[in-house]
Design a protein with these regions (language model features):
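Mobile-element integrase/transposase regions
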Residues: 1-67, 78-96, 125-130, 224
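C-terminal, beta-rich DNA-binding module of retroviral/retroelements integrases
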Residues: 19, 181-249
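Alpha-helix N-cap and loop-to-helix initiation/capping positions
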Residues: 76, 115-119
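Acidic/histidine-rich, metal-coordinating catalytic segments
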Residues: 89-116, 141, 197
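Charged alpha-helix within mobile-element recombinases
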Residues: 117, 123-193, 199-210
Length: 249
């Protein structure tokens, strides 16, 4: 082959290869080194049982691929993510970081949500802040590929398992998840040395309950009560004695 022909072949090869710009490329990222270093979190909407569309909230450890939390709800909700975080705290401890989609991580108060219970952006972020958990977000699905692949795997496998177990409602489905996730981890999670973990010690149940709460600002009225969900509450001390506050003008 002469030089002219050789150069022509090289040019044809270059033209046939679509080279991406660096900013558009999403190369495979190596796993985290330690368990608890990064937890990828997401929710997926799917027909998990016939005639029902639920949202499965899941969390997977980036280091070993272990599913560390899973919970069904009818929508993508604060409760769903709180339930997942509760499972992580109880079974593993406090992770270092959550990595999730900007649409589903809860960092900023949404102006279109009037209810405190719906304001997941403020509530979840505040809970993580109190526990010392960093929240990192991305708008690129490929960046959190492990949880995306987990969603795909569960969508192909879990409906079959739910049908075989004769699950017909969301309450029983959440109970079933406990045994199913253990089975899934035994089959797919990597076996890492247990010392390679950065999970912090599990907080007390009192701290967990106080942290995974819906916080709401209310004003004491002239009758020394607060109003919440159209009900009035009278503040008391730990001993049950009435607590009175001066009302600001």
């Amino acid at each position: 082959m002469n030089d002219t022909a050789s150069e022509k072949v090289k040019n044809e090869i270059k033209e046939s290869i679509n080279i991406l710009d660096e900013q558009d490329a999403h190369p495979r990222r190596p796993r985290s080194k330690y368990a608890g270093e990064m937890i990828q979190m997401d929710a997926s909407s799917f027909h998990w049982i016939e005639g029902e569309v639920w949202h499965l909230h899941v969390a997977i450890d980036d280091a070993d691929g272990k599913v560390v939390g899973a919970y069904f709800d009818r929508q993508e909700t604060l409760k769903g993510y709180y339930e997942v975080l509760y499972q992580i705290l109880i079974n593993h401890g406090i992770p270092a970081m959550f990595y999730t989609d900007r649409r589903t991580v809860f960092e900023y108060k949404r102006k279109d949500r009037s209810s405190d219970a719906e304001d997941t952006f403020t509530q979840f972020s505040y809970a993580c802040h109190n526990l010392g958990i960093e929240i990192k977000t991305t708008s690129v699905p490929q960046a959190k590929g492990r949880v995306e692949r987990l969603n795909q795997t569960l969508q192909s496998r879990l409906p079959v398992e739910l049908r075989h177990a004769h699950i017909t409602n969301i309450e029983d489905a959440n109970v079933f998840l406990n045994s199913y996730i253990k089975k899934y981890n035994n089959q797919f999670a990597l076996r890492l040395n247990s010392t390679k973990s950065v999970y912090e010690k599990q907080p007390s149940m009192e701290k967990i309950n106080r942290t995974l709460a819906i916080l709401s600002t209310r004003t004491i009225d002239s009758g020394h009560c607060i109003r919440f969900d159209n009900k009035y509450y009278f503040p008391v001390t730990e001993n049950g004695d009435g607590r009175y506050f001066a009302v600001k003008d």
